[in-house]
Amino acid sequence: IKNGITVSVEATENAVYGDYLINIRCKDKDSDELEEISLSLTVNEKAAVSLELTNGGESIGSVDIDNQTTYEVQVNNDGNKLDTFTLTASGNDWDTEFENSQVTIDAFSSQIVILTVTTDNDVDFGDDDSVTLVATSQNDASIDDSLSLTTQVRVHYGLEFSTTS
């Protein structure tokens, strides 16, 4: 390639991690001779994750005594490489369980995981319990995101009848 030609290659923010070969061909306007050069480009890995409830779900849910409720948690791989995320729950008193404690997600994609919160007979109407969910990247353990949820035992409404004599 002749002197004086500058070629700039820039990866977009959603470029997928990896090595790429770029072939550049050009010819002078006064010649039919084609010149070619190959360039290599490396897109560095970027790990990123975010957690959210699906479809605008509320971070405060409700449950009955000795029952369970579920939350649909969306795990977003905001990074540019396939990644596996470890999901943990902490700070809670009630039983809290993910259907999958690890999820593998393609770059710039997401997966929904069901979180189940279970109460027993020891809770009372109006009680609540908070939990902090954390998703941690296995590609880079320093990358994580958290989401806080609160579950309340539904207050029992009804009528009470008593007789008077």
Residue map of PLM features:
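Long beta-sheet-rich domains in secretory-pathway and surface-associated proteins
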Residues: 1-165
